[in-house]
Every structure is written in C-alpha cells, then in structure tokens.
C-alpha cells in the first residue's frame, strides 16, 4: 500500500512529495484496480495544481479585498481581518481518508453492509474547501455600552455581513453553492434568501463549542470552489486556542476514525487502507520529518514555510 508518510523523510519539497506520491499511488491503483485510490489521486492532483498554477489566486484575492473595502466603508468603527489559505497536504490527506473511514463505518452501522463504489464515490465528491478565506470581526470596547453587550452586538453584525456577502461576491463573478440542508440556520438574523447557502455552526452548537458560518462559492473565472468562514473574534479564539482548537478537534477525529472494532479487518479493503493511512498521519512525530522548508521542535512548536502542515497563506488583511 502506498502511504504519504513514506515520502516525508527525503528532504524533498512539498511539490516533489506530491508528485512522487501521486505517481506511485496511481501506478498501484492501476495495478490493483483500486477505484478509490484513483479518486484519491485526482483529489491530490487538485492540490498540486493549486500550488503549481496559482496565478488566478491573485485575482481571486483581489476580489476578496473588494469586500474588505466594502466592510471598511460600511463598518468604520469595527475591527476585522481577512485570511486566505490553501489547505495543507497533511490536513487534506487526513480529511480524505477520514471521509472514507467515517462514511463506510456509518453506512455499515446503519445498513449492516458496506456501501457500493458508486455511493462511496459520491461521498468523496464534496471537497470544496481546498481554498478558504476567513473573515473575523470584533467591535472595539470603546464602541460598546458594556462588555456584556459584546457577544450579542458582534453576532448581530456577523449575520448582517453574512446577508450581504453572497450578493456582493456574485457581482464579482462567484456563485454561492447550496448547502443542501447541512447545518441549516434557524437564526432570525439570517435572511431567508441566503439561508440555503450557509452552514450555520452558531445555531447548532457542537460539543467543543465550535461556532462559525460557512459558505461555499464557485469562482466562475478560475473554475474552482472556495469556502468562506465568518466568525467573531471570540468564536475564532475558541476555534484556534480554545476548546475547539485543532488539538481538540484532532482528538475528536481520532476517536471517530479509530472505531476499528465495528469493521472486521480484511472485509473492506477501502476501509482498511484509509484507516491505516489516517492513523499513521495522526501518529506522526513532526520533529522527525525531513521536508524542505519545514521544521518542528515537537507537534506544537512548528515552523512551516512550505504549507505541509499549516497550509499556504494566500492573503491577510490588516485589522
């Protein structure tokens, strides 16, 4: 079986690692007739294309800057920041294998049998966050009657911005993608006309208190998808350094993906391979990796200059 981990100790660049991994994975998939590995190759190829041919991202980021200018004009009293990134190779690989494991497990639990290749392929066609932008807002204390008003006021402004964003970006050449009822908003602050497009993690609280608004757009000029996340500073703190941060998220995902006991080993090749790849990634010791422009003292102290673990920064605005 071809595994990403085996390519992370050669001193190569991320692009070289991707190229070699895709080449070997495709060769093995053709040899074994593994259709899911072929989908896996095409998924990885999207990341490779983004890293190699990213001129369009300059124009895309400029269009996001136009919304930044709009917000600066409409909300001159508010502090806010925009961030953009291409999903990191390790996060993307974790997500792909995690989707395979979770879908097969949940399907088996519900139906007592394994999903068909067609059903699994359909589940693996929904990766639309390889490019993502995040808008974070905060109302300075001097513009609040009291600190107790902060959460209510910032949430009100966040939904106001969410109401405007789809129409604004459509004028810039983007099309909002329906959320298909996933995390459908129940907030009276969100207009009915835009509710079908948002996944509202504010109304539907999770166990780790993660809160955010997510919306997916199709960029008609570059013909690719991108995700936009909207948060208040308080929500972003919870996501980045609080109970919903990536460490807590990874532990939760490890639990979800580690449900090996329900699927007998050897019965479902696609589950077995995705499970093994996922667990090997979760157990990576980053300090031992040898990747060009990447270094880590441990799994918390990381200097990622290549996008291997934390992704490639596209755009950051001043606050």
Enumerate the language-model features and the residues they cover.
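Nucleic-acid processing machinery
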Residues: 1-317
């Amino acid at each position: 079986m071809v595994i990403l981990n085996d390519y992370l100790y050669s001193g190569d660049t991320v692009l070289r690692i991707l190229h070699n991994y895709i080449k070997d994975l495709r060769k093995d998939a053709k040899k074994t007739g593994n259709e899911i590995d072929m989908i896996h190759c095409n998924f990885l190829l999207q990341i490779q294309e983004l890293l190699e041919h990213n001129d369009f991202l300059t124009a895309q980021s400029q269009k996001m800057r136009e919304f930044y200018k709009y917000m600066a004009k409409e909300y001159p009293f508010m502090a806010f920041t925009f961030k953009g990134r291409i999903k990191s190779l390790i996060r993307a690989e974790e997500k792909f294998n995690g989707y395979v494991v979770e879908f097969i497990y949940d399907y088996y639990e519900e139906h007592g049998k394994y999903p068909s290749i067609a059903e699994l392929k359909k589940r693996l066609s929904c990766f639309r966050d390889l490019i993502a932008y995040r808008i974070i807002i905060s109302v300075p204390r001097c513009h609040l009657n009291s600190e107790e008003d902060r959460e209510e006021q910032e949430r009100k402004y966040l939904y106001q911005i969410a109401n405007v964003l789809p129409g604004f970006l459509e004028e810039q050449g983007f099309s909002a993608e329906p959320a298909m009822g996933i995390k459908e908003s129940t907030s009276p602050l969100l207009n009915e006309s835009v509710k079908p497009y948002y996944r509202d993690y504010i109304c539907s609280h999770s166990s780790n208190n993660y809160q955010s608004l997510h919306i997916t757009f199709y960029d008609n000029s570059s013909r690719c998808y991108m995700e936009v996340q909207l948060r208040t500073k308080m929500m972003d703190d919870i996501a980045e350094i609080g109970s919903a941060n990536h460490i807590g998220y990874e532990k939760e995902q490890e639990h979800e993906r580690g449900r090996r006991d329900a699927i007998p080993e050897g019965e479902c090749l696609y589950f077995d391979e995705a499970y093994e790849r996922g667990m090997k990634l979760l157990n990576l010791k980053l300090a031992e990796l040898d990747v060009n422009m990447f270094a880590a003292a441990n799994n918390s102290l990381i200097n990622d200059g290549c996008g291997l673990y934390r992704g490639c920064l596209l755009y950051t605005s001043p606050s």
